[in-house]
């Protein structure tokens, strides 16, 4: 519901039905309505309570709860730093105008993640149950299937985006300004494909007894991202920031998946993904040949 209302607000602003102030007010109303509806729903279930019961939380439970909550907060903060870091470095080193162009590219690339949320929500309860039952054969099989389907879905969306990238920028207002970030869209889309395909490894780790290592790997991701942004943005500009994200996630998943494979004996990677990758690369090669050579030949023939 909230996504649909937000989309409507964005479209109204894009087609000049409302101005910037109207968009801000509309977004505030959208989230306000969603909050009120959630509260009403909770009261209708009669499972919400504001009564404080200190005796319910024992001393050992309180300690574990506080430590685990602090761990989750730290992990979430570190994980959400990467997009903010890129925006911060791009705007700080290249200016707000370039940051705006980069942001549009980020939004276009983020469409690759659309299937991830649904597939991840479906798979997590099954992975959690498998880890609880210590059924590693089932977990390993499920992990590989989830990774493969995430890879297929995200790559399919990326393929649709990339072969229509010029059309997308033509539709966007001032697209002739923003289309200089095409390479950023390409690199960030690859980042999204890697993240959606391999993030099931992080899910496995979070449900295991080694969950606290998640923070270590997230710190590695953050430090790598900061270092690569500092090094690459002055050299390559927006493309440097996108490349910094790509390198950071590659380093992150090398450490993460190696640890998960070593300690938990589970890996999301399989030969099926390699075969799929080869097919996808072949499709991109065909698309490149069509655009670079064959289309020019056809135009030449018809002109003659």
State the predicted function of each range:
Residues 96, 162-192, 239:
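Interfacial segments at transmembrane-helix termini and the short loops linking adjacent helices
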Residues 1, 189-220, 231, 260-262:
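Membrane-interface junctions at transmembrane-helix termini in multi-pass inner-membrane proteins
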Residues 16-26, 38-83, 126-141, 263-276:
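Interhelical loop/hinge segments that connect adjacent transmembrane helices in multipass membrane
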Residues 20-25, 60-72, 87-110, 136-141, ...:
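Interfacial/gating helices of multi-pass transporter permease domains
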């Amino acid at each position: 519901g909230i996504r649909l209302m937000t989309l409507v607000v964005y479209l109204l602003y894009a087609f000049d039905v409302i101005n910037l102030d109207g968009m801000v007010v509309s977004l505030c109303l959208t989230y306000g309505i969603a909050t009120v509806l959630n509260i009403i729903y909770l009261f209708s279930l009669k499972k919400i309570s504001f009564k404080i019961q200190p005796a319910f939380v024992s001393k050992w439970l309180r300690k574990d709860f506080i430590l685990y909550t602090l761990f989750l907060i730290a992990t979430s903060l570190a994980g959400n730093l990467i997009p903010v870091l890129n925006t911060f470095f791009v705007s700080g080193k290249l200016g707000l105008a370039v940051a705006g162009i980069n942001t549009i590219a980020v939004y276009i690339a983020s469409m690759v993640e659309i299937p991830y949320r649904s597939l991840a929500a479906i798979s997590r309860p099954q992975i959690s149950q498998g880890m609880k039952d210590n059924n590693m054969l089932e977990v390993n099989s499920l992990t590989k299937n989830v990774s493969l389907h995430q890879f297929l879905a995200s790559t399919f969306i990326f393929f649709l985006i990339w072969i229509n990238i010029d059309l997308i920028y033509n539709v966007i207002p001032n697209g002739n300004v923003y289309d200089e970030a095409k390479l950023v869209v390409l690199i960030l889309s690859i980042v999204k494909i890697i993240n959606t395909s391999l993030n099931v490894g992080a899910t496995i780790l979070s449900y295991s007894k080694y969950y606290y290592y998640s923070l270590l790997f997230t710190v590695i991701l953050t430090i790598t991202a900061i270092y690569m942004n500092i090094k690459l943005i002055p050299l390559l500009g927006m493309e440097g920031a996108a490349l910094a994200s790509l390198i950071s996630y590659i380093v992150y998943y090398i450490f993460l998946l190696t640890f998960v494979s070593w300690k938990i004996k589970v890996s999301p990677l399989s030969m099926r993904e390699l075969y799929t990758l080869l097919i996808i690369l072949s499709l991109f090669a065909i698309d490149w040949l069509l655009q670079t050579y064959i289309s020019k030949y056809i135009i030449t023939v018809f002109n003659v």
